[in-house]
A protein has these predicted regions:
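Long, solvent-exposed, polar/charged low-complexity segments
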Residues: 4-24, 53, 145, 153, ...
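Active-site acidic/histidine clusters and adjacent loop/turn architecture
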Residues: 23-76
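Inter-helical turn/loop segments and adjacent helix faces that build the functional surface
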Residues: 29-36, 130-134, 201-202
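Amphipathic alpha-helical coiled-coil segments
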Residues: 41, 45, 49, 133-136, ...
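Compact, glycine/acidic-enriched structural inserts
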Residues: 116-174
């Protein structure tokens, strides 16, 4: 289900006008500049991001045919209630492929983001519920081997790195291998790079999907964890 799209459009690559618009909105973040460059935004940033999202959605749907995935492309407009001195427009655009659950920020989600000076993609949680991360640590305590196997494989690759906020105090005794994972409040497996020639390449979706394939074992691990928490909460009601 492509929430944000109607007709399928193939990604042809971003272009220099994409980059120019992103820098422009960063330094000219006001309505008059945006209105003058709205067509540039729609043609050179929004349209290719949607096309990229559609191809990532199709690829992930093929890998995870039983998951109720949807595609979401972000709005460039900031929430007027939360400007906090910032301009009315974001200087970046992101998309995510996720399940349709209402509390999706607490579930594993695949994403791509582009900004004036970087692009990133990966999979992770942004606002994992404390109860979910508590269950995560309980599962590691009870049987660390499944995650250890995944982490050893993860540590051999060069594309993604583990990111996310950590607890200041130790949450328990765990092996050196798993300690960085055990201490996370939420986590993301992220690839971030300065803008380079890859973003202009029509093969970018295929390259990202091949990288996402390497994250599928983590996606399944955390999806199973979410399901276990749902069952546990259902019993408690």
């Amino acid at each position: 289900f492509r929430q944000e799209s109607e007709d399928m459009m193939m990604f042809q690559g971003y272009d220099q006008q994409t980059v120019d618009f992103l820098w422009g909105i960063r330094f000219n973040n006001d309505r008059s500049w945006f209105q003058e460059h709205k067509e540039q935004y729609q043609t050179h940033l929004l349209a290719p991001t949607r096309a990229l999202g559609e191809q990532l959605y199709d690829g992930l749907h093929a890998m995870l045919p039983h998951e109720p995935l949807i595609l979401k492309v972000s709005r460039i407009y900031r929430d007027a209630r939360r400007l906090h001195g910032q301009g009315p427009y974001k200087d970046h655009l992101w998309l995510c492929v996720r399940t349709g659950d209402q509390d999706w920020t607490g579930r594993p989600t695949f994403y791509f983001e582009i900004a004036p000076d970087y692009y990133s993609y990966g999979m992770g949680f942004w606002c994992a519920a404390p109860a979910l991360m508590a269950l995560y640590r309980q599962r590691i305590d009870a049987d660390p081997k499944p995650l250890e196997k995944l982490v050893r494989r993860f540590d051999r690759q060069q594309t993604f790195r583990l990111t996310g906020p950590e607890y200041a105090r130790s949450k328990g005794q765990v092996s050196d291998l798993l300690r960085p994972w055990y201490q996370k409040k939420s986590l993301s497996l992220q690839c971030e790079a300065p803008l380079d020639q890859r973003i202009f390449n029509p093969q970018l979706p295929q390259e990202i999907l091949e990288s996402f394939r390497e994250l599928l074992p983590f996606y399944r691990y955390f999806t199973d964890l979410c399901a276990a928490l749902s069952r546990q909460e259902g019993k408690d009601e």
